Amino acid sequence: MEPGVQDLGLSSSEDESPSLAIRSPTLRKPLKHSTPEEAALGWSPRPSGGASYLSGSPMPAHFSQDLASHPAGVSPPATVRKRRLSTLWASKESSLDLSAPGEEPPTSASLTQRQRQRQQQQQQQESLRAKSWAQNPGLPGILNTTGRKRRDPKKRAAAMERVRQWEIYVLQNIEEATQHELTIEDD
């Protein structure tokens, strides 16, 4: 052993013991979800590892025990109903067809009035979008101040005067050079 290094009393058999071994986190493949609901819930069609299944049931055994422990009509707080888009559309259509017992069935006049209201709302939303886009064609959150900025007429006149003075200076230099017959030689 080297001087200055202390022996902690660990043998090679102790180094390999599972209690002292540092475990690296297992790398998982990212889950692929077929619906946005499944992605939000972190649900995957194949459960990881040690889930035991009831015979013939696609649900793990601990889910069926949870469902059996709750009274009928009350769902456990952890379970979430998943509905497919096609069933949502079908339920909306059927709810439009059926009316409440105390209500009158919808007439064609009331339906056309509802359609007109929806169209007006859509037109208002589109016009608002068009106005907001025309007002700020740049990046969102950054004001477009270039069109609004007006230059002070006095400052503008002063800048134009400076430009005119510079042009006069350059023309005078050119005139002097031609009077003295100075030429620019290329090297």
UniProtKB/Swiss-Prot annotation:
Keyword match Coiled coil: yes
Basic residues composition bias: residue spans: 147-157
Coiled-coil residues: 111-131
Disordered: annotated segments: 1-79, 92-159
Record key words, sorted: Coiled coil
Protein name, entry field: Coiled-coil domain-containing protein 201
Taxon lineage: Eukaryota, Metazoa, Chordata, Craniata, Vertebrata
